[in-house]
């Protein structure tokens, strides 16, 4: 029996529309990671990294340990896309500067990369004239986001979430197509492999139960999860109380950096969860725990709204 595996891939330079020629020396951070770690090949000696995702941050440290000079990490957004601990351990500990609200506006070199020009950007992401700064380098690494590979899922008719580029799933991690389950980075991009393992175990258990028993609760009422006010999405997107386990983890990401705030969940109009956080950021996945006992107290519940509230 043939099997197909889906995963995630790096965004490419073509998706960024960076002006300039296409010289050698421009790699995705994932490609550079494979070259260094598995092939024993050094892509270059003077490095600029565009994007501050976790792979890019880790490669900044890795290239430094291999003897390269990482001159700067540039991030388009006003915040880093990686974990705080990776910023500290991979950049701060090695004296590598991180320029927020900056991007590459020009590439110099025809055959081989000779340097890149960075510029500060405004709130709309447009370069600000007069802020250009040139960095000589022979290597540019792109850490500008990961894309779940869902071509097979889409071809099957699986409904996709435009925010995550992954399938929409219910509490069992089942898609809109009966018997098709999704988990891991093909569902939404994770920062910790622990969460991937938990999702995989849950999806596998639910898929096995479906094979044994079928979808016995096909017409059961579902509760819709509604992400608003700083929350970009939730996984899962719907919940059937009678089908869920005793505990359910709802994972989500925020759309900006929020300090001294609360993560709140409203059951229709009633606030049930109100958890204090010192800081939440897009680079770190958040989660709340729901229990079947909690949901059974609200038999007419239609919507669970997840939001970020100011202290």
Q: Where are these predicted regions, by residue range?
A:
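Glycine-rich dinucleotide-binding loop and its adjacent helix/turn
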Residues: 10-48, 52-57, 163-171
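A Rossmann-like FAD-binding core segment of flavoenzymes
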Residues: 64-151, 246-278
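Flavin (primarily FAD) binding-site architecture
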Residues: 9-19, 147-156
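FAD-site-proximal beta/loop scaffold in flavoenzymes
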Residues: 27-36, 138-190
């Amino acid at each position: 029996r043939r099997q197909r595996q889906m995963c995630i891939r790096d965004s490419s330079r073509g998706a960024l529309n960076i002006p300039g020629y296409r010289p050698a020396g421009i790699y995705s951070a994932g490609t550079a990671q494979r070259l260094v770690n598995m092939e024993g090949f050094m892509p270059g000696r003077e490095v600029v990294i565009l994007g501050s995702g976790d792979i890019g941050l880790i490669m900044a440290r890795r290239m430094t340990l291999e003897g390269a000079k990482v001159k700067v990490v540039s991030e388009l957004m006003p915040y880093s896309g990686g974990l705080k601990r990776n910023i500290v351990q991979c950049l701060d500990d090695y004296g590598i500067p991180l320029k927020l609200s900056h991007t590459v506006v020009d590439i110099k070199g025809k055959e081989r990369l000779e340097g890149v020009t960075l510029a500060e950007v405004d709130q709309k992401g447009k370069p600000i004239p007069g802020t250009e700064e040139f960095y000589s380098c022979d290597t540019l690494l792109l850490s500008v986001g990961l894309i779940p590979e869902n071509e097979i899922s889409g071809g099957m008719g699986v409904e996709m979430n435009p925010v995550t580029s992954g399938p929409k799933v219910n509490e069992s991690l089942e898609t809109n197509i009966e018997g098709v389950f999704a988990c891991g980075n093909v569902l939404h991009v994770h920062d910790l492999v622990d969460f991937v393992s938990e999702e995989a175990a849950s999806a596998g258990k639910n898929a096995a139960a479906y094979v044994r028993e079928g979808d016995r609760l096909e017409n059961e009422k579902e509760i819709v999860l509604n992400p608003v006010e700083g929350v970009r999405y939730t996984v899962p997107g719907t919940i059937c109380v009678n089908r869920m386990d005793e505990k359910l983890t709802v994972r989500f990401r925020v759309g900006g950096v929020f300090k001294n705030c609360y993560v709140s969940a409203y059951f229709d109009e009633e606030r049930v969860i109100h958890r204090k956080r010192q800081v939440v950021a897009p680079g770190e996945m958040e989660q709340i725990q729901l229990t079947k006992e909690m949901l059974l107290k609200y038999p007419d519940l239609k919507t669970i709204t997840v939001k970020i509230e100011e202290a």
